[in-house]
């Protein structure tokens, strides 16, 4: 996947980071904000390995539908590129130019690290659930429900996490 995203370092060192939320009982929840929804993340979900992930279909749709929001939030500074991502993926295109050579190295890294976590969860039998700020519960997005500070959407969020939980045989 690293090479498919344009990775060019002969001996890359990866650091996908920690999980967003580790719950009692071993459930891990990743809450993905707007910077996770773009063509690079969609590319990582195209393989056969991802077909049974409960978030693949909605995430691929959101990558297409919300890439413009990703661009708005992530076309500048370290959200577009940084020295460590350039070591992995090479020089970036001009900020905002995803069709240019290099694209957005930081976006590629984020997509790769999400993919690595997904693959690891599949391989290791980890109970991972991914939800998106763009997911809809009741009449609003998860982001709006979380920002409200109200507890009125707690059960809807719990239900979404349960629906997106990776189940292993």
Residues covered by each model-derived region:
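Nucleic-acid endo/exonuclease domains
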Residues: 1-169
């Amino acid at each position: 996947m690293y090479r498919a995203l344009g990775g060019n370092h002969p001996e890359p060192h990866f650091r996908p980071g920690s999980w967003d939320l580790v719950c009692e009982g071993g459930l891990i929840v990743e809450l993905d904000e707007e910077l996770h929804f773009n063509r690079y993340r969609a590319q990582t979900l195209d393989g056969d390995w991802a077909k049974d992930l409960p978030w693949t279909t909605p995430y691929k749709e959101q990558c297409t539908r919300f890439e413009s929001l990703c661009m708005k939030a992530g076309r500048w500074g370290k959200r577009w590129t940084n020295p460590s991502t350039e070591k992995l993926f090479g020089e970036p295109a001009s900020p905002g130019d995803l069709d240019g050579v290099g694209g957005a190295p930081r976006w590629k890294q984020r997509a790769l690290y999400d993919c690595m976590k997904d693959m690891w969860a599949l391989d290791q039998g980890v109970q991972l659930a991914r939800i998106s700020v763009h997911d809809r519960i009741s009449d609003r997005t998860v982001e709006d429900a979380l920002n409200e500070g109200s507890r009125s959407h707690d059960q809807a969020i719990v239900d979404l996490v349960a629906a997106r939980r990776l189940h292993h045989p």
